[in-house]
């Protein structure tokens, strides 16, 4: 019996920019040979808003409300790096209490970021149930932010040069501890539901593998880097804010696949809860209501009015000038290394403001990862990278 062999032509399809699995306005031009991906070209820029140029025409205080729109799932990290850049350039010291408040806000944001990654990632691979669970926990974090800053997801406008805008409100520390007590068992629930699920494991194990050398050469950061066997976390490396005061571990894996990236993020949420608990317990002056009571009892010359018990070093004037010089500042966000290169020329506006976003760099490896995989694995691999297009395009 003669066998007829057919040769198919490669097919080019567009995924996005409006597809729900694209995690924003990302367009992928995918070349397929049957079910196999031959090539993939990401098309970005649909959400470009000129954030760097806006920064060069605004004072720092005017610019802080803009920055929560870079990565709108990690507004606190954007605000932190925005004030850290002129702080380092002008050598401004931040009170210890303000540093502790900053760390609490950043770690709450890390949890919220990982939760917002977890739900859609699992929905991409076919697990719909956790998508609804994660919003329940995120709402509690937003309630805490609303009590402290007046806003929820974005526009917190909380970080300031030299500290934070206002102290934590009455009873906030207790509410935050209640959230920690509530959230820890929920992470265990996620693990029971997801980690050993055979369908989930089949979809993500061995898929989108990145070796240690590839992760370094492609300049990956955050969970993408740590899941490939590189134990690198800027909170440990750069010793910024007051992370050295706390007992916590860098979470990392060696497999480098989608499953390893999932494990790193799940464990990081536990570490964040651990850091928040220690920060609440060790905060100089304690809860706001206790600190105010001590100040009232001991009068104006009380030691509780010292520098380290303040929420801000000194309120910066609208005419604050960024000194001459240049500096690169970075921090560890939920997605990886967020950096700012700032160049000042003794003006109220920075002369140059360069943003280094984590997911822009992490997204570059996508065409390399997708070559040779099946169409169904595109969503799992893209979802495991964790991109927000507001941050990629800026």
Curated annotation (Swiss-Prot):
GO annotation terms (biological process): photosynthesis, light reaction
EC nos: 7.1.1.-
Location (main, coarse): membrane
Any one GO cellular component localisation term in the record: plasma membrane-derived thylakoid membrane
Bilayer topology annotation: Peripheral membrane protein
Key words of the record: Membrane, NAD, NADP, Plastoquinone, Quinone, Thylakoid, Translocase, Transport
GO molecular function: NAD binding; oxidoreductase activity, acting on NAD(P)H, quinone or similar compound as acceptor; quinone binding
Subcellular location: Cellular thylakoid membrane
Superkingdom field: Bacteria
Catalytic reactions of this protein: a plastoquinone + NADH + (n+1) H(+)(in) = a plastoquinol + NAD(+) + n H(+)(out); a plastoquinone + NADPH + (n+1) H(+)(in) = a plastoquinol + NADP(+) + n H(+)(out)
Bilayer-spanning residue ranges: none
Subunit organization: NDH-1 can be composed of about 15 different subunits; different subcomplexes with different compositions have been identified which probably have different functions.
Known role: NDH-1 shuttles electrons from an unknown electron donor, via FMN and iron-sulfur (Fe-S) centers, to quinones in the respiratory and/or the photosynthetic chain. The immediate electron acceptor for the enzyme in this species is believed to be plastoquinone. Couples the redox reaction to proton translocation, and thus conserves the redox energy in a proton gradient. Cyanobacterial NDH-1 also plays a role in inorganic carbon-concentration.
Family membership noted in the UniProt record: Belongs to the complex I 49 kDa subunit family.
Protein name: NAD(P)H-quinone oxidoreductase subunit H
Species the sequence originates in: Picosynechococcus sp. (strain ATCC 27264 / PCC 7002 / PR-6)
Gene transcribed to yield this protein: ndhH
